[in-house]
């Protein structure tokens, strides 16, 4: 009997030890790696701001010529979309992908910041607009850290005027996504990028927290943004024809 009791106790201790190991997985290494990547990308954002202003002016000068070229050859659409003066503003999800975004949109400007919400974004837009460097289209990755009011979002859209806006929804706050869809239903220039559905079931896209992106996730995220912009511009091209 003592042997059975001791065996039972040993089994209990072993199971408890395994449980403790599973629930106390140390993510310190992953957290530090993500933190270092975001800090490096913040520097990249600052370094590219002045360069964007120069490129935007050059693109404005060449824009009409490019549109004429597109009328003659639809295959040029990829080149045109790639060279758009895209403005991307977002939180640490976008910040983590800025290298990929600059590679895909070399004439773009991307401003990502850790823990950013949509509150206060209008001031950033106004600064760009007042300096004549608010490009088109505009990409937002905002909502992961919480929503802002309807009036806050309406103010953002008013500042953007008739520019095409691509707002990426969240993977963690479905109520934010519902409100974004409702907002888009009354604004024809607001296009929702459904990152929630596209990324669902793809754990390989995410780091330990299920929100920030792995290398593979950043590639898919960037491709998703590009495809959304490309499809809208293609629709406009077809309508124009």
Regions found by a protein language model. Give the residues of each.
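Solvent-exposed, polar/charged alpha-helical surfaces in well-ordered, non-transmembrane soluble domains
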Residues: 87, 95, 99, 103, ...
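Conserved SGNH/GDSL esterase-like catalytic core that processes O-acyl groups on lipids
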Residues: 79-152, 172-177
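N-terminal secretory targeting modules
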Residues: 1-85, 99, 226, 230-241
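Alpha-helix C-terminal capping segments
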Residues: 100-108, 128-133, 155-163, 167, ...
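Substrate-gating cap/lid alpha-helix
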Residues: 23, 27-33, 163-200
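Catalytic His-Asp segment of secreted/periplasmic serine-dependent ester chemistry enzymes
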Residues: 177-241
């Amino acid at each position: 009997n003592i042997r059975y009791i001791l065996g039972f106790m040993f089994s209990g201790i072993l199971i408890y030890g395994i449980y403790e190991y599973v629930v106390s997985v140390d993510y310190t290494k992953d957290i530090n790696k993500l933190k270092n990547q975001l800090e490096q990308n913040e520097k990249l954002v600052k370094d590219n701001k002045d360069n964007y202003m120069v490129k935007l002016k050059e693109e404005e000068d060449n824009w009409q010529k490019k549109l004429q070229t597109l009328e003659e050859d639809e295959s040029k659409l990829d080149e045109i979309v790639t060279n758009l003066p895209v403005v991307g503003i977002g939180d640490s999800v976008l910040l983590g992908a800025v290298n990929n975004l600059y590679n895909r949109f070399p004439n773009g400007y991307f401003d990502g910041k850790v823990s950013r919400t949509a509150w206060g974004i209008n001031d950033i837009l106004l600064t760009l607009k007042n300096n004549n460097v608010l490009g088109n289209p505009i990409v937002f990755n905002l909502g992961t850290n919480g929503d802002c009011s309807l009036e806050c979002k309406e103010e953002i859209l008013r500042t953007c005027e008739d520019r095409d806006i691509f707002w990426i929804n969240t993977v963690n706050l479905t109520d934010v996504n519902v409100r974004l869809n409702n907002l888009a239903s009354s604004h024809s220039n607001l296009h929702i990028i459904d990152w929630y559905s596209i990324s669902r079931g793809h754990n390989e896209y995410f780091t330990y927290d299920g929100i920030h992106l792995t290398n593979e996730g950043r590639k898919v995220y960037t491709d998703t943004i590009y495809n959304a912009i490309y499809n809208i511009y293609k629709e406009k091209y077809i309508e124009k024809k």
